[in-house]
A protein has these predicted regions:
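Noncatalytic alpha-helical scaffold of FAD-dependent oxidoreductases
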Residues: 1-213
Length: 213
């Protein structure tokens, strides 16, 4: 920032911060994270976003023998996200809902299906299997749409994360012409997640943001 006297160069080297403020980098501290050699992921499907959130809260409490979190990452994908990428499980669910094949789900109401892309990592294959077993045991208390299946094969779980990476442009591509994409970060206490996510969906629908996710 102080290297330039020309106002144009000063502005060109600023970055846009929170709420549109301008900022510059005066100091950077880089901290690396341990790259666990063994990883596994699973796409967990639940019939409601509230049930998915309850499962996330429960998995957040899992720790291994060293006190580290068992679940290293959890990304929630609602029905709109799944629909935008033509997720095969979502399409299957939608078909079963349409044919009234799912008890407790109103025909045509496929908006409840929610996926949680879950990742666990470990230093050894044995630790990885212990983590998977702990997560599977935790999930027995919840109702999943399809059986839980973790994979430790990179060629398989990389596809899950590729889907996650493609969600934003895919959802954006479903917007009506002339509309604007708004992005907002919202934080909740983890214990409030089940109620908060369900109420947030209701709030978005009530105000006519039909393409939101």
């Amino acid at each position: 920032f102080v290297r330039f006297d020309d106002p144009f160069e000063i502005i060109a080297h600023l970055m846009v911060g929170s709420e549109g403020t301008l900022a510059f980098l005066s100091e950077v501290t880089m901290k690396s994270e341990y790259d666990y050699p063994y990883k596994a992921s699973a796409m967990l499907y639940f019939k409601t976003i509230k049930e998915a959130s309850r499962a996330v809260v429960a998995m957040k409490k899992l720790v291994d023998e060293t006190g580290e979190w068992t679940v290293k990452g959890a990304e929630m994908l609602d029905y709109k996200s799944l629909s935008s990428v033509n997720d095969p499980v979502f399409l299957k669910y939608k078909g079963e809902v349409a044919s009234s094949a799912l008890p407790g789900v109103e025909p045509g109401d496929e908006t409840g299906l929610t996926a949680v892309l879950t990742e666990t990592k470990a230093r050894t294959p044995e630790e990885l299997q212990q983590n998977i077993s702990a997560i599977e045991a935790c999930l027995q208390a919840f109702t999943t749409y399809i059986p839980v299946r973790f994979t430790d094969r990179p060629e398989e779980y990389s596809k899950y994360w590729a889907i996650r990476s493609g969600i934003f442009p895919s959802v954006g591509g479903t917007r009506q012409p002339g509309t604007t994409c708004l992005i907002e970060d919202i934080a909740f206490h983890i214990e409030d997640l089940p109620v908060a996510t369900a109420e947030l969906q209701q709030l978005i629908a009530r105000h006519g943001y039909n393409d939101a996710c």
